A protein has these predicted regions:
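Conserved short "hinge" loops at termini or chain/domain junctions
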Residues: 1-78, 140-159
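Core structural elements
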Residues: 77-88
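Short loop/turn elements at secondary-structure junctions
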Residues: 2, 88-159
Length: 159
């Protein structure tokens, strides 16, 4: 169906880390050089979790008017966009060199944002109609009760 369970976010750290080449990890971590492999893995995993959290929040911001977010089941397209945005978040920590391979990450991020903008406008669907805002059962409806009018033309006559 193109949906998957959403336990933590719209993508996993493993999925995001698969998209990053090993030689990029040091530049993502930043100025501190970490020789110990376990320590390096902990650092990049923590950064990746933050990047995923930010990506999911960004996606939810675009989709909140059309869908009930966060999704309980992640549509496949949202998984892809979350990975692209999270990778961009990681790579852009130290700036994007548009003449290098980072340009690909910038292009994928821009494409993701363009797609989300179109979803927000209603021209594209993410395939999660069961979670669309306002698609719930309206059989119970709602009632509105108010007191009678206090001020009217007749009651205010002469003022």
């Amino acid at each position: 169906t193109g949906l998957r369970s959403n336990d933590m976010g719209y993508c996993t750290t493993g999925e995001v880390l698969k998209m990053i080449k090993e030689d990029m990890v040091n530049s993502i971590i930043g100025d501190e050089y970490i020789e110990d492999a376990d320590e390096k893995q902990q650092k990049i995993t923590a950064l990746c979790e933050d990047a995923i959290s930010d990506a999911c929040a960004e996606i939810d911001g675009y989709l909140a008017k059309r869908y009930k977010v966060p999704f309980t089941k992640t549509p496949q397209v949202i998984n892809k966009l979350a990975k692209d945005i999270a990778v961009y978040n990681l790579v852009s920590r130290t700036g994007i060199d548009e003449s290098e391979r980072e340009k690909t990450f910038l292009n994928r991020y821009n494409a993701a944002i363009k797609f989300l903008t179109e979803v927000a406008k209603g021209t594209i669907s993410v395939g999660a109609e069961d979670e669309a805002v306002g698609s719930g059962n309206a059989a119970n409806g709602f009632k509105m009760k108010s007191s009678g009018r206090i001020f009217s033309r007749d009651s205010m006559r002469g003022w």
